[in-house]
């Protein structure tokens, strides 16, 4: 989700191995796809692929109706109308969030682009429209491709200490020791435990992957931004609030669609509240969230699946969001 770019009147990116140009108008999402090397393997029509990726089948009205009836959630819901939780490819999602530790969104985008351009396969979008003629999209590199790279090569993409973790996890996934697809059958608790066994994955990254790749909509990632909002809006007078208490509150308060609530709060805090200065909090250090991020990013790359008994210490937005699955249109001239 970090690689999509505004081009012309639409957005350019990749859905798995497919280069895609998407443009929305009048509640209709028009999508064009570039060439792929294995067209025979894909039997689904493009509208179905796009609708699945952007989760256009999620009952957004019902999900929003399940949000807590409190001022901050009401404001966030009104501000973020149409925001959806996308369904990302599992390996791409996991690798990207391993790279995200202690990084701002702009830096994550830079890393994602560097990995794609250095290790990913280039796909061209031909005859889409003049604004994007001959535009090349690099798809995210496979686990096998990154497993055959080196730490130095990954560091040259801006990963720093994260290179060790990404390389180790890529090798586990590539070898089949970490079977990301098979993990879909696990319960939420077991899935989180499996993810946290991987190098570079702590509670926050695990929850991000559960939410965006495994569609576990109860997952509620807590980073510095979210903790800041939670403390200010729900615990303004609490001097001592550890991460365990905060997690339990989120589970009970936000419920079965906590992941959606988290995204609405996150986007609202980073845009409307930040611009108005309303998200300012006291100078009390946000130790629990920061420690979580350190755990996510600095876990040793020598961890393996066999160490499962060791305890872990611990937007994509469819424009307007009103497009339904039936309104996705495959534009003429698709390849």
Q: Which stretches of residues belong to each language-model region?
A:
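HhH-family (HhH-GPD) DNA N-glycosylase catalytic core used in base-excision repair
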Residues: 1-298, 302-335
């Amino acid at each position: 989700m970090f690689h999509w770019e505004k081009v012309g009147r639409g957005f350019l990116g990749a859905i798995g191995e497919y280069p895609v140009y998407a443009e929305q108008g009048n509640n209709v999402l028009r999508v064009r796809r570039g060439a792929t090397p294995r067209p025979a393997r894909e039997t689904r029509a493009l509208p179905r692929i796009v609708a699945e990726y952007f989760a256009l089948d999620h009952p957004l009205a019902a999900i929003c109706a399940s949000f807590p009836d409190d001022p901050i959630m009401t404001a966030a819901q009104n501000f973020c109308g149409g925001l959806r939780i996308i369904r990302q490819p599992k390996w791409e999602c996991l690798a990207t969030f391993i790279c995200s530790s202690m990084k701002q969104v702009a830096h994550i985008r830079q890393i994602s682009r560097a990995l794609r351009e250095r290790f990913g396969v280039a796909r061209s979008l031909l005859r889409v429209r003049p604004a994007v003629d001959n535009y090349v999209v690099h798809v995210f590199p496979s686990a096998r491709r990154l497993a055959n790279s080196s730490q130095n090569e990954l560091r040259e993409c801006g990963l720093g200490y994260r290179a060790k973790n990404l390389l180790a996890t890529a090798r586990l996934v590539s070898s089949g020791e970490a079977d990301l697809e098979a993990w879909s059958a696990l319960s939420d608790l077991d899935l989180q435990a499996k993810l946290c066994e991987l190098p570079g994955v702590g509670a926050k990254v695990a929850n991000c992957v559960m939410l965006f790749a495994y569609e576990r909509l109860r997952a509620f990632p807590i980073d510095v931004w979210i903790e800041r909002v939670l403390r200010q809006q729900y615990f303004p007078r609490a001097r001592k609030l550890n991460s365990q208490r905060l997690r339990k509150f989120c589970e009970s308060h936000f419920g079965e669609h906590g992941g959606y609530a988290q995204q609405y709060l996150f986007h609202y805090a980073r845009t409307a509240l930040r611009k108005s200065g309303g998200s300012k909090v006291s100078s009390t250090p946000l130790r629990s969230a920061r420690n979580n991020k350190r755990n996510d990013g600095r876990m040793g790359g020598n961890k393996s699946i066999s160490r499962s008994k060791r305890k872990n210490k611990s937007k994509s937005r469819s424009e307007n969001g009103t497009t339904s699955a039936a309104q996705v249109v495959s534009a003429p001239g698709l390849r």
